[in-house]
Amino acid sequence: MSLLTVERVSRRFGSLVAVNNVSLSVEPGELRAVIGPNGAGKTTFFNMISGFLAPTSGRILFESEDVTRLLPARRVWRGIARTFQVTEVFPELSVRENLRIATEVAAGYRRRPWISREADAEVSARVTDLSDMGGLSDKETRPVGELSHGDQRATEIMMALALKPRLLLLDEPTAGMGDQETYNITQLIRQLHKDHKLSIVLIEHDMRVVFHLADRIMVLAEGAMLAEGTPPEIAANEMVQAAYLGKAA
């Protein structure tokens, strides 16, 4: 049974068709990549999966349940978490405080005026684990806004992981990074995928990252699916070469 099934979704903004009749199926534990030129509809597609936009037509199933009209928070509770093109963190708070907020949200504690000592200890232990997994333990007392772009992105990814998702959506996780930061984030994604058996769908422009990580790749162009296949199949696809990979080269 597929974890995520996107059935023929479209999104129109007036006369503009941003996403046109796109389908996608993601299996448990699979790592998918979505690529395409700027303006291909990738982020709009993500926004529909995560609930920030409603499709004009089509439907979205998560674990066979129709979530097409669910709000983003409801989808988080179902097991869908995401990061954004522009890193979404609390820059004035420390790494640890950011991770604690996400952990408390996942546990339902943010809606309570107080929590027990035992619960507080569990949250603290979970935050420490997240910090260690993200390679952030030596920076966890620093404000996130003072960190490098790569460490800010790692913080955001670990905040998403704190929500205990079964599906993690990563929107251009290495955008704006140099080679070392790109390598670090790529290794982090690979390790999280392996250790937590997560299903991951990522949007990415760096083809080194895509071909290193993805089990399968979907190519969007002008809002429609141009091709789908394994990394070798996509690399050899002449239509993809003409529309995207050839330009990137």
PLM regions and their residue ranges:
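Glycine-rich phosphate-binding loops of nucleotide-dependent enzymes
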Residues: 1-249
